[in-house]
UniProtKB/Swiss-Prot annotation:
Highest taxon of the lineage: Bacteria
PANTHER family xref list: ALKALINE SHOCK PROTEIN 23, HYPOTHETICAL CYTOSOLIC PROTEIN-RELATED
Residue segments, region Disordered: 1-40, 144-166
Species lineage: Bacteria, Bacillati, Bacillota, Bacilli, Bacillales
Organism whose genome encodes this protein: Staphylococcus saprophyticus subsp. saprophyticus (strain ATCC 15305 / DSM 20229 / NCIMB 8711 / NCTC 7292 / S-41)
InterPro entries: Asp23
Family: Belongs to the asp23 family.
Name listed for the protein in its UniProt record: Alkaline shock protein 23
Gene name of the record: asp23
Transmembrane portions of the chain: none
Pfam families, alphabetized: Asp23 (PF03780)
Main function: May play a key role in alkaline pH tolerance.
């Protein structure tokens, strides 16, 4: 006696309620529904601030040196820019950080660099989830704390005079 496989399969499908065409239609509907997507991103300025704050926390860093625009803005009294001396390149999952610093005389630049690198990487990763793949630090100047304090006192008093505050 010959058994017709198609009839047996059809009978089984009818019994279990499974129909290949229905299954294919359900699959197509699932594929057509819009897929939920989301994205968290950060502006370069946010990463610059995080890196700038972290770098300033390291002992031996007296100040972060900015470029021309930062120097002009600090001459008008707004020298509390935490991203001064920091530039970054930010991708979707990674960031690269460049720092310009003034070191305290007598401190070890390689040790400070390691501390800065570790802290910047740690803080950027914790706050944003981004991996810092590169940290470059350029030492723009070396000063004693006394020299640095005197320089800052002079610049603050001249800023106050310019504003008529003295």
């Amino acid at each position: 006696m010959a058994v017709d496989n198609n009839k047996a399969k059809q009978a089984y499908d009818n019994q279990t309620g499974v129909n290949e065409k229905e299954q294919e239609q359900r699959q197509e509907q699932q594929n057509q529904q819009p897929e939920f997507t989301n994205k968290l991103s950060f502006s370069d300025e946010v990463i610059e601030k995080i890196a700038g704050i972290a770098a300033r926390e390291v002992s031996g860093i007296l100040e972060m040196k900015g470029g021309f625009v930062d120097n002009i803005s600090s001459s008008f009294g707004s020298n509390n820019n935490v991203s001064q001396g920091v530039s970054v390149e930010v991708g979707e999952k990674q960031a690269a950080v460049d720092l310009k610093v003034v070191l305290e005389y007598g401190e070890s630049a390689p040790k400070i660099f390691r501390k800065v690198t570790d802290l910047v990487k740690e803080q950027v990763k914790y706050i944003t989830g981004l991996d810092v793949v590169e940290v470059n630090m350029r030492v723009e100047d070396v000063m004693t704390k006394k020299e640095w304090s005197q320089k800052n006192e002079k610049s603050q008093s001249s800023n106050n005079e310019d504003k008529g505050l003295q």
